[in-house]
Amino acid sequence: MSLQTNHRPVLVVDFGAQYAQLIARRVREAGIYSEVIPHTATADDVRAKNAAALVLSGGPSSVYAEGAPSLDAEILDLGLPVFGICYGFQAMTHALGGTVANTGKREYGRTDINVAGGVLHEGLEACHKVWMSHGDAVSEAPEGFVVTASSEGAPVAAFENKERKMAGVQYHPEVLHSPHGQAVLTRFLTEIAGLEQNWTAANIAEELIEKVREQIGEDGRAICGLSGGVDSAVAGALVQRAIGDRLTCVFVDHGLLRAGEREQVEKDFVAATGAKLVTVDERQAFLSKLAGVTEPEAKRKAIGAEFIRSFERAVAGVLEEAPEGSTVDFLVQGTLYPDVVESGGGSGTANIKSHHNVGGLPDDVEFKLVEPLRDLFKDEVRAVGRELGLPEEIVGRQPFPGPGLGIRIIGEVTEDRLETLRHADLIARTELTEAGLDGVIWQCPVVLLADVRSVGVQGDGRTYGHPIVLRPVSSEDAMTADWTRLPYEVLEKISTRITNEVPDVNRVVLDVTSKPPGTIEWE
């Protein structure tokens, strides 16, 4: 399911940049649809996608390096607006007859550029900071291009050709370290390329609902596995809006959920969508499979395998209850655009990473996949969810791992330990919300060090309790993350409440590790 037919995409040509997906997100934040394609794409590939414009991403190479990624020169003859960024700026220069040289002045990090007119930087300070990351630099712009910015290490830090609707910058406008970067990118898209800003949550929701109707048809039936997370909830809400009670949502309670999550799905999701919901209580089955298991990967595998078996049983029940003569042919999944790109979808394929499929279903049950969110980024999914009327408690929910609290208990998972962690997690989430910090942090895993005991003093006696770890992080995409600097008074309140209210916990510690080197989750 794709939105290409309704929106001519701005194609982000990926030269191996870590920021290609981020560029695509920034284009969409400007209100214009975008997709990522590999640099190996040909002019015919671009024509086939009916592109509205091209953005050439950065990359780690020199344009003169052996095997450096190159651009099909015919693409620049298609008459499309083109915007080059960093390596893409240099590749564009090279292809159009300009000069890229090793000036001997590398620039990495925050750098001052001096602006000399032009559309891109109109209204900005004559000297302002941007984020650079380059060795080579453009020393001479292609014929017909006007140089509009320079820096100490880049004689040509930006250029424009309004007649050809082409422009480029040596720096990275897509990162937050370039404070005016979003404005510069938006000015290219609207002022130079002349594109309409019609990519909105309302339009997206309306188009996706119609496409689901087309795919499933007037009589088709579908099943959707709800995890309690944002993606499956929004996917389920979209499909329910499209086909009504021909959708059955299945929620497996594996006992590894946080406080209130089952109730949130059973009450809030159903109330907001009117969806038909089947809840399967598999708590004891999961606990029995996790008994004695302490190794993190073994936990994940045990939880994953048991979830498949639980979902199989739920699907069998739904199939049995389907009206006589009807079948359930479609499986709804919350696959997002980054999953499609990472699995090869950016090059025109439709591979889905295995962990996004419900594997292990019976051989005689074959579903056609319905993936209404496969063109969307996470922030867009949240916006669509709000447009569909889902409560903020669902659409604003922090990311939560599939194995749940099972991988936030360091040690064996038992019912008592789950209750301990669930209580501590609820306190932390409540205090962060009351302090107005939900919009500041990406997520805050709360971890129980169940195999560790620390000595403490509570009341008049010595205690040997477990430590709780708080792991608040800030991120845009979870690929990298920094620990969040929470106010001391909030940390104090969380710590005091947890050590006073949660049995067997006498210490709260703060994880101040960034990613890399540490991952967001402990297991």
From Swiss-Prot:
Residues annotated as catalytic: C86 (nucleophile), H172, E174
Enzyme class: ligase
Binding site for ATP: S227, G228, G229, V230, D231, S232, A233
GO MF annotation, one: ATP binding
Cited InterPro entries: Class_I_gatase-like, GATASE, GMP_synth_C, GMP_synth_GATase, GMP_synthase, GMPS_ATP_PPase_dom, NAD/GMP_synthase, Rossmann-like_a/b/a_fold
Domain Glutamine amidotransferase type-1 per the UniProt entry, residue ranges: 9-198
EC number(s) from the headed UniProt entry: 6.3.5.2
CDD domains with a match to the protein in the record: GATase1_GMP_Synthase (cd01742), GMP_synthase_C (cd01997)
Domain GMPS ATP-PPase residue range list: 199-397
PROSITE patterns, A to Z: GATASE_TYPE_1, GMPS_ATP_PPASE
Pathway annotation from the record: Purine metabolism; GMP biosynthesis; GMP from XMP (L-Gln route): step 1/1
Chemical reaction(s) catalysed: XMP + L-glutamine + ATP + H2O = GMP + L-glutamate + AMP + diphosphate + 2 H(+)
PANTHER family cross-referenced by the UniProt entry: GMP SYNTHASE [GLUTAMINE-HYDROLYZING], GMP SYNTHASE-RELATED
Function: Catalyzes the synthesis of GMP from XMP.
Name of the molecule in the record: GMP synthase [glutamine-hydrolyzing]
Gene: guaA
